[in-house]
Amino acid sequence: DSTGGGETPSRDVVFTYRPTSAAVAEAETCATAIVGGLARRAYRRPVSVGDLDQLLSFYREGAAEAGFEAGIEKALRALLASPEFLFRVERDPDGVATGTAYRITDLELASRLSFFLWSSLPDDELLDVAAADRLREPAVLETQVRRMLADPRAETLTTRFASQWLHLPNLDAMQPDSRQFPDFDDNLRQGFRRETQLLFKSILDEGRSVTDLLTADYTFVNERVAKHYGVPGI
């Protein structure tokens, strides 16, 4: 509901501009700024005139029916249903033969980085660098990767990527012999999963070798896992 619920953090993110009068032109200027900014994030690239015209046509329909906020809501519905938002599109460059390797654009690289490291959209800083065709520069790329890894959103690299790579969801299907492991329960299962995630995170945060996943002489345990391993004093 675009008009209910009062001010909330999510509404504040969307409604960064508001008309101060009933003038249609002022409302459309605000709508253009709002929709254009959100489309740039959602499409993960600069927004073309055609992109904006299409989205504003939905805004005008909604605004004519129920006012400014309803118009923004209708434009956002169209934005979120767009293939440009739902799919990560990488177009072959003109003149490249089928099957030939080619360098992806900086904007495509920005999307790959953000979805890999954050499982989310690129932020404004990453998009700005990519739009300026500077992201492929080694020093700039390293700076952006380090910045992204220091961001709390990089936690998803531990919880999602590590889980997928190491098939941690398969733990849910494991049912050890209850006669040999009578104390095995879901708390222990969750402890094993978190142990692996924290080990992966420590390797990433401390710049250790990936082989530490196999050779590390340390780990992370809670009381339940420590008891299972026979580790005293925890």
Language-model features, listed with the residues they occupy:
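Low-complexity, glycine/serine/threonine/alanine-rich intrinsically disordered linker
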Residues: 1-234
